[in-house]
């Protein structure tokens, strides 16, 4: 008998408790060797005054287990509340979000029956750092953070995932034609890492045309890797194209822990009616089983689910007259899956988690994994084990031997340190004089600045308004004022001298950003029109 593995389960909000109960019934019926620690997350916790939605005692259980199966939670709208999902992902360093999206044609209606792609999303950085400020009466700001180690970890993960699971192409999507430093860094790292994987094709798309092509022809994509915000949006679009977002699962993988969840939300409008589709959370649970080393149980459960779909036993979100055989609720759907445990689908490709990616002989595992596999019939939703981050092939070896994962530290390369010089500072100010004339503001700032600090630029919402601004440009009360030093500063004292002079003149300083060059190359972007 397998040793039971303890995992943490959070039923969540809305339809969460209903679908969680259904999923746990299926896992128990399949003989999953699991013990559950139930925790409360989300709405009820927010009402207790915990703004993160995660109570302290829940952290202890999650960290001790290293594995969380989470139902959907509701984050209250408005200020003062943090997303539970984002909080858990960032706190536990769950840097990789893996969302497979596959059509189950002809049993679930989809406009794209051939789609079978995986979206791998950076999970910790980008705008989801959630650092926002209201800086003036009219202007708010969000900080977009992108690091080289963060980029390299997720890009390397994507290529190793592709190599391990027989995927042939990795597509990077960014908006680096506009965000040249942040998205530009992600693109550059992608190109650097891609060169190390000559067996995997690679390409890059600007996110807007990439999203359009994904919506129009998802079957042309294989693996997409992208930044946090873009990946969140793209994966929901792709999930809906499969026929229902209720089918989509998400694995959040880190070096010490993992979280598995459905992609959909808490759907409070149908909560308590017993009609919610538990498929997304069930597929997430099979990902969790593979992650924990119970691939045989995961295979039994997923194949039973495929048989249920194949037999036309469908919840209302995927039921179609003439296509489905019977419309059932949440509990009846779970009963149907349980009744089919031990069976394999006849038309849909059965999954083979015990054998890993393909049904090859055990002794040939290592060699087989290193070769691209035929896409046809490739299992689309095997979770990537944290140990695989040393390289994903290690996961397959572990999964075959049915051993639980042991965490490892992901190694990233460190670029050589550049000659970093402080050459100026962007001073952001609040100024709301009549007319909001940039030339007037510039004259005031220049008269207040000390010798050696030259005002070179003023922008408003990123558009140059001084020198030679245009009268048609609309201006708010928020101004970026770029000062350049006549020579590189030896320390921050030059900035303090400038800021002291401006403050003494009555300038309302909101924030500053230092301007650095790295081996002579600017570490900052030009203003629009500069």
Enumerate the predicted regions with their spans.
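Glycine-rich phosphate/pyrophosphate-binding loop and the adjoining helix
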Residues: 130-131, 139-172, 176-179, 308-352
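N-terminal glycine-rich phosphate/adenylate-binding segment common to multiple enzyme folds
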Residues: 46-141, 229-231
